[in-house]
Amino acid sequence: MSDRKLSTREDADVLLEEELKEPRRFRVLLHNDDYTSMDFVVAVLIDIFRKSREQAMSIMLSVHEKGIGVCGVYTAEVAETKVAMVHARARAEGFPLRCSMEEV
């Protein structure tokens, strides 16, 4: 917190409002491609996003049928980390799986 003195009630209200702001949230998305196996997508969803097998299957089918699927909603740092983890794992396994994030 800053060392400056609060001179009015308005200053206190502004500082309190700033302290209570919710962090920005981001959807993490998986994108369909013609090469990544469905089994690999399910494994990524279970291992990286901590989805149940049923949830992972549902998201994987959305990716397959609609071209995109939502893995979850996270703060910016968590979303960035999960995107990087997906890309690293996909590259290590030789898949071109794309993962992205968008602000909610």
Swiss-Prot record:
Involved in the modulation of the specificity of the ClpAP-mediated ATP-dependent protein degradation. InterPro entries: ClpS (IPR022935), ClpS_core (IPR003769), Ribosomal_bL12_C/ClpS-like (IPR014719). This is ATP-dependent Clp protease adapter protein ClpS. The gene is clpS. Belongs to the ClpS family. It comes from Oleidesulfovibrio alaskensis (strain ATCC BAA-1058 / DSM 17464 / G20) (Desulfovibrio alaskensis). Binds to the N-terminal domain of the chaperone ClpA. One of its GO terms (biological process) is proteolysis. It holds the Pfam family ClpS.
